[in-house]
Amino acid sequence: MEHSRPYGGRKRMSLGNILGDPFALATISISLLAWFITFISCVIAQVQANKNKGLPDKDNPDGNFPPFAWWAVVYSLFLIVGVVIVVASDAIQTYHVAVTGYLAGGMVLVTSGVNSLVYSKNGAREAAAAGFILLSMVVIVWIFYFGSTPSSTPRAFLDSFALSKDSGAMHNQAMNGYGGTGRPETSNSVQPPQMYTSAQLNGFENPSPVGGASQAPTAPTMPTYGNNTMQPNNKSNDEEVLPPIDYPYQAKAIYSYEANPSDANEISFSKHEILDVSDVSGRWWQARRRGTNEIGIAPSNYLILL
């Protein structure tokens, strides 16, 4: 149900987020249909109950219409509207916990409405109970969807049918949820220490350079003894030798991701792209794109291991 938006941009409602996602479109359509069936049936049942009010019990076996059912109808309407707004605004990752809580409360109300109407012999009340049953089935599916993590297999399978599911859906959650910590240090994020040969370090007691220094320390002028003169080594530094990084894991992108423009360590990738991963510990994985061999870090909740 996620859709794209510019990095750090304001969330805007777009019907394309619903129309482009078969799961969102189907469940919202069914819920609206179930709600209209329930609402119209409750109106008819309420009119019939008011008409039969004051009659003996034998002429009015169903009694008064339960007011509780109206509260369930109104709550269900706000529940559906809330889901539509959250999905259309591409704010699922921001409000999925709140939506799950509201859905759980709605499940209690809807099933209670079924219990108060399903045993009646009145056709309108039975139709209202049928609408509540259909609505409760949609609510159960929504609770499972919104309560699951994006990397879970069922949710990733449902999201894979979306026509346009791009980068911004979980970018802010990934940045805020991680709080800028727990990110692996990569060759792009930290400059490795300089590597020196023994000849370059001749005469130094502590050969360790300052981490991150871009130039080797200048050798001091050494004293002269007789004909033997200690000359500073003006030889250029040997080329930096870094151990090769293995990428033993393969991961598939379940969402597209757009790298933060202010962070050169992140890489962008598209949905369903296969990445080579060097380490799967932590919340950010060092990955390499195939074809371009671009290396950087990627949020683990956008990827699923193969």
From Swiss-Prot:
Residues 1-23, 89-96, 148-306 are cytoplasmic. Induction: Expression is up-regulated in insect hemolymph or in artificial media with high osmolarity. Also induced by heat (37 gegrees Celsius) and oxidative stress. PROSITE patterns: SH3. CDD domains: SH3_Sho1p (cd11855). Pfam families: SH3_1 (PF00018). It is found in: Cell membrane. Coiled coil: none annotated. Residues 246-306 form the SH3 domain. Plasma membrane osmosensor that activates the high osmolarity glycerol (HOG) MAPK signaling pathway in response to high osmolarity. Affects fungal virulence. This is High osmolarity signaling protein MOS1.
